[in-house]
Amino acid sequence: MGITILKNEGLDFHARISTPLSEIDDDIQKELLDLTKKVKIAGFRVGKVPVSIVKKKYGTSVRNDIIERRINHSVNHVIKEHNLNIIGRPTIEELQNESDKALEFTVKMELLPKITIPDLKKISLDRPKLEVNSKDVEEQLEKLAALTKNYTKESKAKIKDGDQVTIDAIGYIKEKAFEDGKLNDFKVIIGSNALIPGFEKQLIGSKTGSEVDVNVTFPENYHAKDLAGKDARFVVQIKAVHTAEPTVIDDEFAKKFQSNSLEELRTHFTKQIENESEEAINTIMKMNLFDKLEKLLDFDVPESLLEQEKNILKSGTDKNEQDESLLKDKSSKEITAYYNKLALRRVRIGLLLAEYAKSKNLQLEPDDLRKVIMQQARNFPGQENMIFDFYKNNPRAIEGLKGPALEDKAVQYIFNHEIKLKEKKYTKEELEKYLEAEEQRITLI
């Protein structure tokens, strides 16, 4: 076997490989002889079929198999001989495969870069810490009390905020009743904003038995596209009005929600408020870490990975209205530069984290995959069981989660064992503003 290196620069390795015709012919002859002992051909006993007959029947397929094996063997030999850390499948070009000539071909391989892990202990980040106060907890208790109000007392007074109103309604657009515009015995809490914006407010001041004309405009993003943005008039019959009995927030109230006391329910809400912000904090912390890493990394990345990531980004933007709006006023040159920079960042950080996980011998556990599946499910409120069933019944989809799961594990390990974290305290209101600002920023990265 002859090997001529054509290119060994950066992350590209190209070589021309040749195998003498005599070696190919020897391999073919051995294979044909072996087949004479196995094949069944009419008119011949097994093991007594002439080579010429076997060659006539199987010669082409045998040659193709031998060529494929020789190519694979030669490529693997080059990889081992030159200690190449390749990515993807080698590309075979300029194949010379005539039956009377030596086997020759060019192999092109893309290499993974040599990655030096930076000193992560030099990185420091602020970690937001939510300080839940009594006001935050009391607001949650009030919301819970409002949701569980008992509307048993019928009222003949004028409708006011907080009343439960039972209505019949027929909707008209340009004086024509429209499909799905009818409500029967529909109960709505005034001020809950359960109906189209402005609908509930126009019922205030009316009484049981009265008829009210309600004029509204369907939101532009209304789920029924044929109604979105259109003006409508509803003829509403007020059938009943009920006021809520006052809710006393005490130990008895708490017991309705599997708590032994009001204090225990308060503790539950404190933890719930803390947990609600934890996922958003972790996402932002991860992006802040990536910001730091991006400045430390300058190695070349494989072109194939870069192109793959750019295609993923473009596909994602096409489906995401928020991302699309960020780029709508940009020139094609600016959009290309944006994708190039973001793809380079993601590929570099992904390769670094894979190398870091390898250096620390981090292994995926079932819990790691469960966490990623839970994160996916939270993106589809109300469809969680469908997401769980999808991954349960699709092993290949689970395989696709292993990369992100290992990346998350590496990031968590870095947070716990490498970088310096400084706790920064926020009130609930301050944290919400911070998270909102950060979430807008990270949509760009």
Curated annotation (Swiss-Prot):
Gene3D superfamilies: 3.10.50.40, Trigger factor ribosome-binding domain (3.30.70.1050), Trigger factor, C-terminal domain (1.10.3120.10). The keyword Chaperone applies. Keywords: Cell cycle, Cell division, Chaperone, Cytoplasm, Isomerase, Rotamase. One of its GO terms (biological process) is 'de novo' cotranslational protein folding. GO terms for cellular component: cytoplasm. GO terms for molecular function: peptidyl-prolyl cis-trans isomerase activity; protein folding chaperone; ribosome binding. The keyword Isomerase applies. InterPro entries: PPIase_dom_sf (IPR046357), PPIase_FKBP_dom (IPR001179), Trig_fac (IPR005215), Trigger_fac_C (IPR008880), Trigger_fac_C_sf (IPR037041), Trigger_fac_ribosome-bd_bac (IPR008881), Trigger_fac_ribosome-bd_sf (IPR036611), Trigger_fact/SurA_dom_sf (IPR027304). It comes from the Bacteria. It catalyses: [protein]-peptidylproline (omega=180) = [protein]-peptidylproline (omega=0). Residues 162-247 form the PPIase FKBP-type domain. Coiled coil: none annotated. Its EC number is 5.2.1.8. It is found in: Cytoplasm. Its main location: cytoplasm. It holds the Pfam family Trigger_C. Belongs to the FKBP-type PPIase family. Tig subfamily. Involved in protein export. Acts as a chaperone by maintaining the newly synthesized protein in an open conformation. Functions as a peptidyl-prolyl cis-trans isomerase. Consists of 3 domains; the N-terminus binds the ribosome, the middle domain has PPIase activity, while the C-terminus has intrinsic chaperone activity on its own. This is Trigger factor. It comes from Rickettsia africae (strain ESF-5). The lineage of its organism: Bacteria, Pseudomonadati, Pseudomonadota, Alphaproteobacteria, Rickettsiales. The gene is tig.
